[in-house]
Amino acid sequence: EILRCLVGSEMCIRDSYISVYGKNVLDSEIMAKIAKNLTELIGHTPLMELAEYSRKYGLKRNIVAKLESFNPAGSVKDRVAFAMIEDAEARGALNPGATIIEPTSGNTGVGLAMVATIKGYHLILTMPETMSVERRNLLKALGAEIVLTDGLAGMAGSIAKAKELRDAIPGAVILQQFENPSNAKAHEHTTGEEIWTDTDGKVTVFVAGVGTGGTVCGVARALKKHNPDVYVVAVEPASSPVLEGGEDAPHRIQGLSLIHI
């Protein structure tokens, strides 16, 4: 309930003036710096140098991590969720109060739940019944409706169910992060530009894990526009080397090597 209140809240100030450190100032001066909802806090996440790691391994280069956990719903997928919904609105594919359906068991669902609640959409997430109770409860707390599918059918079963629901619900939309161009564009226009700016254009190598491919592709486009020599590394599990032409195989790294390539 607390999560839903936070997601749906707007900050209200009753008085015409606010006292800050003993000084009265107009609310407009304060409100200009205060977010009205959580979507305004997406992005502009901090960079942190991993100095101890560099010292431990005797590295001659600085390694910097972008802390996407600072996004309001806790992951890089907040950017994708917001971008896909904004794009669907701009194209006229998503009408006010409509239903959004997405087959996902990961952080994209969390981001979509947050953004959909803020914007007043009904969100249905389809996922295998094998997903943890904790993940289901989090998504429900953020306002999403959960539809479980046969665990043996995996995500393919969840995708099929999402399409079935879309066909049955008037005006419903599947955003489909694996196929949606807004996925990579979100990182091209925000994440990549932030990295370039915050490193003063000194970034030489970018490394990212590959699930949908949106992060690594989008950031690569942005950085290479500024410097074509930036070296990009796509990371996948050694036991499931799909990008190298190998076979998809089980592994323990959630969100990587999702075979929708």
Enumerate the predicted regions with their spans.
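Acidic/proline-rich low-complexity IDRs
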Residues: 2-5, 25, 58
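Sequence-pattern detector for short linear motifs
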Residues: 7, 25, 80-82
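PLP-dependent amino-acid enzyme catalytic core
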Residues: 30-259
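Short, Lys/Arg-enriched N-terminal segments with co-localized hydrophobic residues
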Residues: 9-10, 14-30
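Single conserved hydrophobic/aromatic residue that forms the stacking wall/gate
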Residues: 1-15, 259-260
